[in-house]
Amino acid sequence: MKRILFFICLACCLQMEAADIFITPDSSLTDAVRKARELRRLGKATEVTIHLSGGTYFLYEPLRLRPVDSGLTLVGENAVISGGMQITGWKRQGKLLVADVPDFNGRPIDFRQLWVNGKKAVRARSVPVGLPDGSDPFEQMHRILTYDKKNHVLWVPKAAVSKIMKAPYAEMVLHEMWCTSNLRIKSCTAQGDSVAITFHSPEAKLQFEHPWPSPMTPNTGHPSPFYLTNAKELLDEPGEWFHDIREHKLYYMPETSEKLTAIVPVLETLVEVVGTAEHPVRNITIKGVTFSHTTWMRPSEKGHVPLQAGMYLTEAYKLRPQIDRPNNHKLDNQGWLGRADAAVELRYTEDVNFEGCRFEHLGGSGLDYILACRRGTTTNCTFTDIAMNGYVCGSFSPEGLETHLPYQPSDFREVCTGQHVSNCHFYNVTNEDWGCVAICAGYVSGINIEHNTIHDISYTGISLGWGWNRDLVCMKDNKVHANLIYNYAQHMYDCAGIYTLGNQPGTVISENVVRDIAKPSYVHDPNHWFYLYTDEGSSNITMKDNWTPSEKYLQNANGPDNTWENNGPQVGDSIKQKAGKR
């Protein structure tokens, strides 16, 4: 049994109002939270702070905070809350190191990430880990030849897949305009210089029936690039790894004389803050804590075919004839969505705040205000080495609602309102799902996104709104102010530094600086990028005083009453100097 140490310092001897609980990494976070509950329940304290001393707190299940924990503060002193497990017992096998993967909580595990000495290693893949000149190794991706929608077959050059023709668990990562799909390969059949690839279900049906985004072929534009991963046959460079789930072995090709501290993720979520509509979780603050080492296993189990911003399709198909929508253009497709897990997830909360935290080494998203969250600040936090979205807020259509339909819940408490994300630093997020976003806000009201610095990301910097629809919905009074965004769109286009969807009365996007877009050669349309982009249904939005190197903007199928005022290179230096993290 783990040793549990609690040192409780009480504010006064008789009627105590505050208490402090001090724990160490060999203590239980869950037990500390329970102790805080009991102090409050027994009337011994009204405010409790749990102090996490330095070190790594390995979890075997998510830490759950409920309405009974309202008023709690967690303070970290170089503390890491980890969903990982250390791998030890490495043995040399030629150029590789191999270790047994132990069970976790009594069962075998699988994972999609590995961190070695604090750095994400590369899951064995068909493109180089890096190139001597520092250029983008993904420039060496192969391109598809064509695809057969009816029979669910994708054709590729034989040279591209020759190594993995018989690999049992290989995956294709397919670049599709503004998304990437993860497709588990079922079969490879050679015919001359080409190979016909089929995929496992359920993603095979989704991949060939969803119309947007679709892969490009030589007949439709720049053919879609792809790379292969998760096959031992691809493990050929230092820094790469492969997990043999049949044999429960982990293979890693090390740097010369590299001494390993290796961690694999075993949890998908670290902290769940969950209340109810009548009894939300209130007034919780988490300070100075690092959240690390999660995975997200759905792509390994069911594939991953997203519509946009990493929101994955559960069903999708093309409409014939198209649907007439009053005040909107005709609709040619249907889609229902799910969302990836995040390291920290919130539902039915009020004033749950994060100050000076780090979200890093994560295989899903970072921080997600999912449903019915009121207020809540995220300040002076760092988001880095995240596979998917960094900060996420609001609904992206409930699972049962077709995603192009307007979302206007009868109970407005469902809507995330009044969040404030400021003075945060986002970089090297979206590093696995390239179609994800640093700050991704869907159906939100009164969100304030200001003075953040965002750079080195795969796609769009800030995405605000959802729905592809100009009908009046629950979005309003949002603010995007004085953010600095650069080196974005490193892998995907049809993007912008700041991007909007839908009708958002009272929304103002002002005094932001957007510059320095990346120029990958493999995007579907090399001209389809923008600094500012109001997409379908965007209405009642004010864009003013934003500095960009040129007026490369797009207004696509917008609704009424958008205002564009004083945006471009003429905006004053004082605005440029004030943008970003302070």
What are these regions (language model features)?
Residues 127-128, 140, 297, 522-582:
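Extracellular beta-rich repeat passengers
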Residues 16-19:
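Boundary at the C-terminal end of the N-terminal hydrophobic targeting segment
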Residues 4-13:
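Sec-dependent N-terminal signal peptides
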Residues 46-48, 55, 61, 70-72, ...:
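The right-handed parallel beta-helix/beta-solenoid scaffold, focusing on the short coil/turn
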Residues 61-62, 268, 295-301, 341, ...:
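Short glycine/acidic-rich loop motifs that flank beta-strands on beta-rich extracellular proteins
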Residues 22-348, 353, 399-410:
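Extracellular polysaccharide-degrading/modifying enzymes targeting complex plant/algal/animal polysaccharides
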Residues 282-293, 330, 350-361, 373-388, ...:
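Right-handed parallel beta-helix
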Residues 51, 58, 64, 73-75, ...:
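Extracellular beta-strand solenoid repeats
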